Amino acid sequence: MKQLKPNSKYLLFGQALSFMGDYCVLPALLILSTYYHDYWVTSGVIAVRSIPMVFQPFLGVLVDRLDRVKIMLWTDVIRGVIFLGLTFLPKGEYPLLFLALLFVSYGSGVFFNPARLAVMSSLEADIKNINTLFAKATTISIIVGAAAGGLFLLGGSVELAVAFNGVTYLVSAFFISRIKLQYVPIQSENVREAFQSFKEGLKEIKTNAFVLNAMFTMITMALLWGVVYSYFPIVSRFLGDGEIGNFILTFCIGFGGFIGAALVSKWGFNNNKGLMYFTVLSIVSLALFLFTPIFAVSVIAAILFFIAMEYGEVLAKVKVQENAANQIQGRIFSVAEASIGLCIAVGSMLINIVDAAVIMAFIVLLVSGLFLHTKLVNKSFSERNNESEQIHL
């Protein structure tokens, strides 16, 4: 940390606080949505949070033409003001206004990540350090944010958690305003070329079995994430009034992810052992989460689920990085980002359409299909490695 330059420190501090607020407010928003007594509003919270991701791949065109630091600054200011404004909205009233404000906030937020990545690329020697520190800060921020939200709820009201998120955005904006980088506009590709890049990413996914499997993994996990998020308020009811349960379950995201990241090297890549762990954990943890009436069991199930999801996420990214040309990887991940946002939204809507048994049956079929496809791809990977070794001999 001491070796980081001032610009890197400001970016890291701002993002750590902002991420902490994000996971403090997520359960708070799910709690507020239950006051509308309509699960479509709960699903709507998840949908407006994820749908803007669909447009993120095409925003690089604008980001390259504007001052990236100012984009980050004003994005955080807008988000901070909106979340502070949400605290004045009466509970259970004006559902469309509630969702519209969230959509504007998360919609503006999709400009932030491309700008942040572009700023990080300007940090020169600090790039590796800040990426490593940011990865570590992510899981810690989730845990601290969820814990802070729980304390706010116990100490006063759920609105405090929402206000806390607004404050973290404004503090993040303060740190970002101190970043001193010379603005150099870049004449990047136009919108038509951006769509062409997107199509090239789709083509690579269709023709490369390894990349297709990575994509299959990512959209499957996104659907599962949407389902789990939508059930947070229901599962939380098994713990007293249920409100604090949302924060405990959000804590599980960070805790499970932390364990999952640590297990990646032990479970391995492109082997059937890791695949079996991922498949069994995904199905068993979701079954427990959806059907058990015991909150303690739900917490254990949530931790196991997020362990599996962290492992799957790392596996999918590495599969793309190892099996696709470097110049095409950005386009593949652009398609992935758009698909993930859409699939999280779809997964969150299932609770309003079919019951838990049908959702579980669908998940079993989907994960089983992923298991079979991955096993075939792993076999191809093993055969390819054996052929490569024989050539070198």
From Swiss-Prot:
Claim: Transport is one of the keywords in the record: yes
Residues forming coiled coils: none
Family annotation (InterPro entries): Bacilysin_exporter_BacE_put, MFS, MFS_trans_sf
Transmembrane segments: 11-31, 43-63, 69-89, 92-112, 133-155, 160-177, 215-235, 244-264, 287-307, 353-373
Molecular functions (GO terms): transmembrane transporter activity
GO cellular component: plasma membrane
Membrane topology: Multi-pass membrane protein
Database matches in SUPFAM superfamilies: MFS general substrate transporter
A family per Pfam: MFS_1
Localisation: Cell membrane
Chain's role: Part of the bacilysin biosynthesis operon. May be involved in self-resistance to bacilysin by permitting efflux of this antibiotic.
Similarity section: Belongs to the major facilitator superfamily.
Protein name: Putative bacilysin exporter BacE
Native source organism of the sequence: Bacillus subtilis
